[in-house]
């Protein structure tokens, strides 16, 4: 305790000296800020759900708002117009990433796609990953895996429906997304994999996301190593390293398995491709891969891929279960389109259900998987809504707040897919009131695959089954309480009773 108090005193003392030296009239017309405390700035105003805290602060301060996290200024964007200026008008000037402690560790020194600062190396890595995994041709090819895994889920749910017990749909949909991504990336079924513990993988993914988005004193008090000392005393470094080692052990087992010449595989997966490139590359090749690069890529593919699919399906089914008439309407569209005797849903069926697509859009609006886009950092001075944002400043775009802006959406807290009837707004990065995948150079490269998983998953759930609340509950008892930082999960798992439709 004495050491912690001494550390806090030293941070405060050095910080106050730093502030006094920095006080001067700024030449910039900076965005407005809410009142701050000495040393900590606005950190005391950030709750367990930062996107909600930022929305409340923006309502009082402005949609372009300057916060201070310790000694680090952060601009928070909460309007469509400001988001368009950041992500389109000034995209090239602010498309790099800040170098944060958690993201540096999990990305193995920025050897991934998501957290690597902008530059030639990042462009080459992204180009490679899109070509080998996320381009339209690859997504179409991997469609058979999505179909097969959805079919397996239908069979399991059909077996569960015999006695009509409630099913943990949150876990079932997580496993569906994980099974698809593991087969695509690793060439093996999630359930049959000998080195993956099904009961612990969701915990590892949640821990990894928390590590990537965690607030550390090292990030916000970068003065004389005192922030690092505070993290060491609090156990933050130990926890981050523990998450890293667990994730690293998983990916090392994957790589070792792929290095076995006798391994059976049903297709050449992305790990095979990356290992081939690594073994055959020349010193003059524009793309240089090491084992750390491969592990960094796998972190992006698995973590982001599973979340996009699983969480979107969970939130969509949550909202439909809370609105029985709405569920009946979307099921009516699907069953009228497909008839009563369809045995299997395929990717060719995706363009036959426009109302389901509206349900997905509305889910993205009300429950974006990433409520705050990954932080950007300005490389040069820019102006947003008339305010100056100097170089080396972090920017957060609050897509969750934009999706609930009453100036853009009528009754924004209401789940109403019909708002998208005759509405051209789409989620592919060109309409800045709906940004589940971001926009510009940093738009999510796996958007196409993620959408395919969501569409086919929901189609199977809604065509083959009716859904009821568990005994003792009604649809009004199903809540939407959130948890998480980098991504937002349903805090209480969604449990529903499947009724197989004959």
Swiss-Prot record:
This is Cytochrome P450 71B16. GO terms for molecular function: heme binding; iron ion binding; monooxygenase activity; oxidoreductase activity, acting on paired donors, with incorporation or reduction of molecular oxygen. Keywords: Heme, Iron, Membrane, Metal-binding, Monooxygenase, Oxidoreductase, Transmembrane, Transmembrane helix. It comes from the Eukaryota. It comes from Arabidopsis thaliana. Its main location: membrane. The chain crosses the membrane at residues 1-21. It is found in: Membrane. Belongs to the cytochrome P450 family. Heme binds at residue 444. InterPro entries: Cyt_P450, Cyt_P450_CS, Cyt_P450_E_grp-I, Cyt_P450_sf, Cytochrome_P450_71. One of its GO terms (cellular component) is membrane. The keyword Chaperone does not apply. The keyword Heme applies. It is a single-pass membrane protein. Its EC number is 1.14.-.-.
């Amino acid at each position: 305790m004495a050491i912690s108090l001494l550390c806090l005193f030293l941070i405060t003392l050095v910080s106050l000296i730093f502030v006094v030296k920095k006080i001067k009239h700024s030449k910039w017309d900076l965005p407005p800020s809410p009142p701050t405390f000495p040393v900590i700035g606005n950190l005391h105003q950030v709750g367990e759900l930062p996107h909600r805290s930022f929305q409340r602060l923006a309502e009082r301060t402005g949609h372009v708002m300057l916060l201070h996290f310790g000694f680090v200024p952060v601009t928070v964007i909460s309007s469509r117009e400001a988001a368009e200026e950041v992500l389109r008008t000034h995209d090239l000037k602010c498309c790099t990433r800040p170098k944060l402690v958690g993201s540096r560790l999990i990305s193995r020194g920025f050897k991934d796609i998501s957290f690597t600062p902008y530059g030639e190396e990042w462009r080459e890595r992204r180009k490679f990953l899109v070509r080998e995994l996320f381009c339209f041709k690859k997504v179409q090819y991997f469609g058979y895996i999505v179909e097969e895994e959805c079919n397996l889920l239908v069979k399991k749910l059909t077996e569960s429906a015999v006695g009509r017990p409630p099913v943990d749909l949150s876990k079932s949909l997580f496993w569906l997304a994980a099974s698809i991504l593991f087969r695509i990336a690793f060439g093996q079924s999630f359930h049959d994999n000998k080195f993956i513990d099904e009961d612990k993988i969701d915990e590892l993914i949640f821990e990894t996301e928390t590590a990537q988005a965690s607030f550390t004193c090292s990030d916000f008090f970068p003065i004389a190593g005192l922030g690092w000392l505070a993290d060491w005393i609090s156990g933050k470094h130990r926890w981050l390293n523990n998450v890293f080692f667990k994730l690293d052990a998983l990916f090392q087992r994957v790589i070792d398995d792929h290095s076995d010449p006798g391994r059976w595989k049903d297709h050449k997966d992305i790990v095979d491709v990356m290992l081939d490139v690594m073994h055959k590359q020349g010193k003059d090749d524009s793309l240089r891969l090491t084992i750390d690069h491969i592990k960094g890529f796998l972190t992006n593919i698995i973590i982001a891929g599973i979340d996009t699919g699983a969480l979107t399906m969970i939130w969509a089914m949550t909202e439909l279960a809370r609105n029985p008439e709405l569920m009946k309407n979307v099921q009516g569209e699907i069953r009228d389109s497909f008839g009563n005797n369809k045995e299997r849903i395929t990717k060719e069926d995706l363009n036959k259900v426009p109302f389901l697509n509206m349900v997905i859009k509305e889910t993205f609006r009300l429950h974006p998987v990433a409520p705050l886009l990954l932080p950007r950092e300005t490389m040069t001075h820019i102006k947003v809504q008339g305010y100056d944002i100097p170089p080396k400043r972090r920017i957060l775009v609050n897509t969750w707040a934009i999706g609930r802006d009453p100036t853009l959406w009528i009754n924004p807290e209401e789940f109403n897919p019909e708002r998208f009837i005759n509405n051209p707004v789409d989620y592919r990065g060109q309409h800045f009131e709906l940004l589940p995948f971001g926009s510009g150079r940093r738009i999510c490269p796996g958007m196409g695959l993620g959408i395919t998983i969501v569409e086919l998953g929901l189609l199977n759930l809604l065509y083959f089954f009716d859904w009821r609340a568990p005994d003792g509950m009604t649809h009004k008892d199903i809540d939407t309480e959130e948890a998480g930082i980098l991504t937002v999960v349903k805090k209480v798992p969604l449990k529903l009773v499947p009724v197989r439709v004959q």
